[in-house]
Design a protein with these regions (language model features):
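Short hydrophobic alpha-helices and adjacent helix-cap/hinge residues
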Residues: 1-221
């Protein structure tokens, strides 16, 4: 979804699915053409999220990826990206499918039975709708879990790497103002906040290292 204003120089701010694979942006830090802004869908960020989760839970020899197979293209892209990242990190990757609230519950029971070391929640509307359920299940089964939205960390999720949906409108206003003042859109990165929940980390017996704290945009106590 693109939005533009006549007052803006021929460049536009993009909101919603900004993904490097589409060619819309060359990278999250440096985009090409006439688009910049905030990425809401985190499909193209699976590899980075897996890396950060592995750094937070280095003892995990197996990490699961939760995807919704109903989204065939999106699920497949996330699986391929995660598999490539897992090989590079030398960790085993387990793909877990869930389409509904009941299937999410069953997925966590399976993960606990298999003693999976950590979980990466893929990008899908069902998982956002069931955010509170997923956070609660991760706590119940003591599975370190990474989420795509910072909304998850505000309700007890361990960590997130993705857009703060509640902050999108404010940040778009900031970007628009900077462009109107003459800043080139090519100098504005696509924003992807990283946040940790220290209370959840302590409950899981995890220590957030100084290097991870250094890249965090926020820490929820």
């Amino acid at each position: 979804m693109m939005s533009s204003a006549r007052a803006l120089p021929a460049d536009a701010i993009t909101m919603a699915a900004v993904e490097t694979a589409t060619g819309l942006v060359a990278s999250l830090a440096r985009r090409r053409g006439k688009a910049t802004g905030l990425s809401v869908l985190a499909i193209g960020l699976i590899a980075k999220r897996l890396e950060l989760l592995h750094r937070l839970v280095p003892a995990a020899i197996s990490i699961a990826l939760l995807v919704n197979p109903a989204s065939a293209g999106g699920a497949e892209r996330q699986k391929v990206e995660a598999q490539t990242a897992a090989r590079a990190l030398e960790v085993d990757l387990l793909i877990v499918n869930a389409r509904s609230k009941d299937e999410i519950e069953a997925a966590f029971v399976s993960l606990a039975t298999q003693h999976v070391g950590a979980l990466l929640v893929g990008a899908h509307p069902v998982f956002r709708t069931q955010n509170d359920q997923i956070v609660a299940l991760a706590a119940r089964y003591a599975i370190p879990t990474s989420y795509e939205s910072t909304l998850s960390t505000t309700v007890g999720g361990l960590m997130s790497y993705g857009t703060d949906l509640a902050d999108v409108s404010r940040q778009l206003g900031v970007y628009t103002g900077r462009i109107l003042k003459g800043v080139k859109p090519s100098d504005l990165p696509v924003m992807q906040p990283t946040r940790f929940n220290s209370k959840t980390a302590k409950a899981l017996g995890l220590e957030i290292s100084p290097d991870l704290l250094a890249i965090a945009d926020g820490m929820i106590e």
